[in-house]
């Protein structure tokens, strides 16, 4: 919403958005910061390199940044609230992976089976198609309940169905549709760290027959995720990652060899997923600031092997499902939102201008 400044901010460096989102951040032209803050009209943007933090940490920082901006531009807020960090803003920077490492051995490996890749004609270099779908949470929750699944599983299932229908044309295929679903590990371990603390799961659909129905796909995705989102599986993820870090033999390997190995691991892991769907949860805003905040979006950048990604964010009674893509073809986006509408979930769509045909 419009925030009219009530005091001068001329001494504060401000950068207006003038490019597509999620472009490369040239560190040496950005004061060596691995994040970038810009604005556009009524919107404040934060772009973060994942090495700094995950979605929860990024949202915590952005929320505190917006709070500070509102206090600076509204004298009544500054007088009432002072110039302190919000009481529920964590400054904890512990390595929760190491803290929760038990040393127990698990037979855990990252999968390397290649998945379906979304390919086609690309948009111009640096261009990114961004489509937001606004959904009413009470209606969406009731519909997901009809299928006996969570909202996250319901939406991931419809996205997998859209890939199956539009990209595979409802035909069998030897490679699986594998959608990476990051899991926030903080609730599992009682952590409040602002550093990265998440685990990777995969919602897998094996297209082994023709004409799957949306109900069948949602059920397959639900089964796939339930097998993985367990405390024991999260323990195994932490154990696998931290044990490699603590392995003395691996620590003695020359850095250039490690770099080559990491590139191979990254490439193998990237090609094992068709896309990503990440849910950053509900944005919690203090009552005093709510009149000034209207909505929140999350946009994911593209990575090797993944030319389309999705993010889910919520504020009050509205959920925003965002699809970012560097492909010209918008058939998957259209199928996704049309399927939701056909199932009785109204959708309001907004795009950045690269995907008008979705409307």
Predicted regions and their residues:
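Structural preference for long, well-ordered alpha-helical segments in enzyme cores
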Residues: 1, 58-65, 140, 151-163, ...
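Single conserved hydrophobic/aromatic residue that forms the stacking wall/gate
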Residues: 2-13
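Flexible, Gly/Pro-enriched loop and linker segments at secondary-structure and domain junctions
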Residues: 23-37, 76-81, 92-133, 264-313
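Gly/Ser/Thr-rich phosphate-binding loops and adjoining beta-strand/alpha-helix segments
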Residues: 31-44, 118-186, 318-319
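Non-catalytic, low-complexity flexible loops and terminal extensions
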Residues: 43, 52-60, 64-142, 340-359
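Helical lid/core segments from catalytic subdomains that handle acyl or acyl-like groups
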Residues: 130, 197-281, 288
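Acidic/histidine-rich catalytic neighborhood
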Residues: 177-210
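Extended, hydrophobic beta-loop-alpha segments that form or line the acyl/peptidyl-thioester binding
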Residues: 305-359
């Amino acid at each position: 919403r419009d925030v009219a400044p009530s005091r001068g901010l001329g001494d504060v460096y401000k950068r207006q958005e003038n490019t597509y989102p999620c472009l490369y951040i040239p560190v040496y032209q950005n004061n060596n910061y691995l994040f970038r803050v810009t604005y556009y009209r009524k919107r404040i943007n934060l772009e973060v390199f994942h090495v700094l933090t995950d979605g929860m940490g990024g949202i915590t920082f952005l929320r505190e940044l917006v709070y500070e901006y509102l206090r600076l531009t509204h004298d009544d807020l500054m007088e009432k609230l002072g110039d302190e960090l919000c009481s529920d803003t964590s400054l904890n920077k512990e390595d929760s992976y190491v803290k929760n490492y038990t040393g127990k051995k698990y037979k855990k490996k990252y999968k390397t089976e290649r998945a379906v890749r979304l390919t086609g004609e690309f948009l111009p270099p640096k261009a990114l198609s961004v489509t937001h779908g606004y959904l009413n949470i009470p209606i969406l929750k009731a519909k997901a309940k009809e299928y006996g699944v969570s909202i996250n599983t319901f939406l991931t299932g419809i996205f997998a169905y859209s890939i199956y229908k539009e990209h595979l044309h409802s035909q069998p295929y030897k490679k699986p549709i594998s959608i990476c679903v990051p899991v926030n590990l903080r609730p599992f371990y009682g952590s409040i760290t602002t550093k990265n603390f998440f685990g990777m799961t995969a919602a897998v659909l094996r297209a082994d027959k023709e004409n799957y129905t949306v109900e069948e796909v949602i059920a397959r995705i639900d089964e796939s995720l339930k097998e993985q989102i367990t405390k024991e599986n999260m323990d195994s993820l932490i154990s696998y990652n931290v044990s490699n870090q603590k392995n003395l033999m691996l620590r003695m390997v020359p850095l250039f060899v490690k770099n080559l190995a990491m590139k191979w691991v990254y490439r193998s892991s990237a090609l094992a997923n068709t896309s990503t769907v990440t849910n950053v949860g509900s944005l919690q805003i203090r009552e005093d600031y709510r009149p000034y905040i209207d909505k929140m979006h999350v946009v994911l950048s593209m990575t090797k092997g993944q030319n389309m990604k999705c993010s889910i964010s919520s504020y009050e009674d509205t959920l925003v499902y965002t699809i970012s893509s560097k492909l010209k073809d918008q058939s998957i986006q259209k199928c996704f939102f049309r399927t939701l509408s056909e199932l009785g979930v109204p959708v309001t769509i907004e795009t950045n201008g690269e995907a008008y045909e979705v409307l």
